[in-house]
Amino acid sequence: MSEPQPDLEPPQHGLYMLFLLVLVFFLMGLVGFMICHVLKKKGYRCRTSRGSEPDDAQLQPPEDDDMNEDTVERIVRCIIQNEANAEALKEMLGDSEGEGTVQLSSVDATSSLQDGAPSHHHTVHLGSAAPCLHCSRSKRPPLVRQGRSKEGKSRPRTGETTVFSVGRFRVTHIEKRYGLHEHRDGSPTDRSWGSGGGQDPGGGQGSGGGQPKAGMPAMERLPPERPQPQVLASPPVQNGGLRDSSLTPRALEGNPRASAEPTLRAGGRGPSPGLPTQEANGQPSKPDTSDHQVSLPQGAGSM
């Protein structure tokens, strides 16, 4: 009779269970790690024990201060904490301050007067051993106490008006000066007089007042006009209303001044502006009965 063979299935089943347990623990650890990572992103902290809580609480406030601090504040704090930088900063502040005095209480005033320094508020600086900036400044020799701010101040020039000043920056208003302007040839002329009014810089009006100046046209150098005999204007031309050169009397041809000034008036009425009228000579004026009337001068009657 054959003997029954032993069953080998239980060892294989145990091996499979071992691999299954390892896989389950691996998956649980992976899931726990992912949960901690997600909670850490949301702001939670995953701890393995309670002993680390006080240490984390002590480290948390400095981190908040560093996050709230600005870069400039950190630089200033580092500069002030250094004693050498604090002394240099104190010297700079002492040189740049002006001569301002502040009223103090009676106790501070008496103590400062006994020391020989003016009344002031006592100042305290970080990182410096000096009790007061003004007290240490008063102990310096007088040559050192002179501020450098006075050297930078410049005297105001003539014609400048200071609008406002901030520190060493000033805004000034400069008044414009109107004087004599020179031509290219070097002769000074005043541009304040213009064409209005007909006045020249010599004080004359028109062509008859004052001496003509050098460089003026030739017509302004003519002598003043003399009174001429009573001569009425020649009859105007029918089509244009202007005097014809062929009808001009011969007596006027000898006077270049009278012939150079043509007379224009409506209808040919009234005497010429360059000749004296009858009213100027004291004779009563007669009514003009004809619009076209020509009177020759006294010497031209015999011609």
UniProtKB/Swiss-Prot annotation:
Primarily expressed in spleen, thymus, testis, peripheral blood leukocytes, brain and placenta. Not detected in prostate, ovary, small intestine, colon, heart, lung, liver, skeletal muscle, kidney and pancreas. The chain crosses the membrane at residues 15-35. Its main location: membrane. The modification Phosphoserine is found at S52. Residues 278-296 have a biased composition (Polar residues). One of its GO terms (molecular function) is collagen binding. It is found in: Cell membrane. It holds the Pfam family RELT. The keyword Chloroplast does not apply. GO terms for biological process: positive regulation of cell-substrate adhesion; positive regulation of p38MAPK cascade. GO terms for cellular component: basement membrane; plasma membrane. InterPro entries: RELL2 (IPR042313), TNF_rcpt_RELT (IPR022248). It comes from the Eukaryota. Keywords: Cell membrane, Membrane, Phosphoprotein, Transmembrane, Transmembrane helix. Phosphorylated in vitro by OXSR1. It is a single-pass membrane protein. Residues 148-158, 172-188 have a biased composition (Basic and acidic residues). Residues 46-67, 132-303 are annotated as: Disordered. Residues 194-212 have a biased composition (Gly residues). The keyword Secreted does not apply. Interacts with RELT, RELL1 and OXSR1. Interacts with PLSCR1. Interacts with TRAF2. Induces activation of MAPK14/p38 cascade, when overexpressed. Induces apoptosis, when overexpressed. Belongs to the RELT family. This is RELT-like protein 2.
